[in-house]
Amino acid sequence: MNQQHLLWQRLRRSNLISIGCLLMFTVGILCLHPVANPRSIEAAPLASNPIKHIVIMVKENRTFDDLFGTFPGADGATTYKDPQGKTHKLNHQPDRLVFDIAHEHSSFLTAYDHGKMDGFSKLPGAMQPVNGKLVDVADSQFYQSDIPNYWQYAQTFTLPDHFFYPIQGPSFPNHLFSIAATDDDVDANPTGNNNKTNTWGCDDPKGTTVEERHSNGKVTHVFPCFSDFQSMGDLLSAQNISWKTYSPGVNKGGYQWNAYDAIQDIRETGQWKQHFANYKQFISDAAADTLPTVSWLVQPANVSDHPITSVCAGENWTVQQINAIMQNKAVWNSTAIFLTWDDFGGFYDHVVPPKGPNAKIEYAFRAPLIIISPYAKPHYVDHTQYSFPSMLKFTEKVLGLPSLGGLDKNASDMFNAFNFKQQPLPPLVLQQRTCPKYSDPGLSKIDWS
């Protein structure tokens, strides 16, 4: 096995890790099993709608307190309680961790601890070496100086502080919620014969399954390629509204986060060729004003913000993509960007999540979300309760689409974060910054395209 494959396997597995174990990287994502016969409820189109482009960017493995716990005016925390009930200051998180923290469904339950929110330090991978000392990095956070550009976006535009992950587990279900507003009770990543591929969906080899945990306690396993629930792509195609999913190529690092790979009527038909584009095309499409009405932008794994990668490098990549929109006045003046992350990643958050329709797996901790648009309320912290389906509810309402019939049906539409009558905010073109250098080689040499 060559060095490149070894490195990617470290970035691919989501197993439990201890200090003495080999360096590994979890890129968790859960697969949604379909919801049958979703009811279509017509949404009223937004009058005088200035939004012509909606961009959904989903990065990896963070909580609100991890990135914005010190943000002024937000519901953040700078301390945590340990399992003995003692209060401690949250540790300062380094730019790059040594390995991943466990964050599957069982890890959520451990961290949640029946609502006491004191079990994060018990997670495998929580204790890691930082500057020669073992530090509880699960109970840690970044400061403004560590992620200055993410903070500039949050300070300039709108920062919701009660935006919850739908599923108490890893990436896959939440990515599916970002395209379909449902997950049919899936609570884990696809596993089995896909341990040597970067796929979670219809491209998985036979024998791959994903777990579903139903509200009655029953657990089932299915192949992660679904045909009996609608995605937002289906709704858009039915109305001849343009859309694309931009991601790394098939079997490249990060491709598994392209949730449309799990939608059979898109992945296994001509729709895939029509609506799939390599992530490298996003910048040129923005520059040429050829972005579709709705875009999902999936990053390569090395700039995903997922441990073990550098958050500085991930922030720089994000700035590049958003700059491309802001540097084209016509595109910027008609765009709403939703920049969020996909699961809690094992990191602390202090807010007890609400219960969802399937209380066995819904909802999880708060996700960071920044709403970036000329029509986002400026310098605004939005305390409204949202979740991933709210981004789709916004899309439905802006475009006059029917409901997908999942959690979007009763979700808040995020209009509280916007003022479509305000003077459009100017673009905020940011500079990339110089990132720390690391001794272990290989990440920069992998073909992530």
Q: Where in the sequence are the language-model features?
A:
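Generic short N-terminal amphipathic or hydrophobic helices
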Residues: 16-18, 40
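N-terminal pro-sequences and low-complexity stem/linker regions of secreted or lumenal proteins
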Residues: 37-449
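Structural motif marking the loop-to-transmembrane transition
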Residues: 12-16, 47
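N-terminal secretory signal peptides that target proteins for export/translocation
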Residues: 1-13
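Bacterial N-terminal signal peptides
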Residues: 19-33
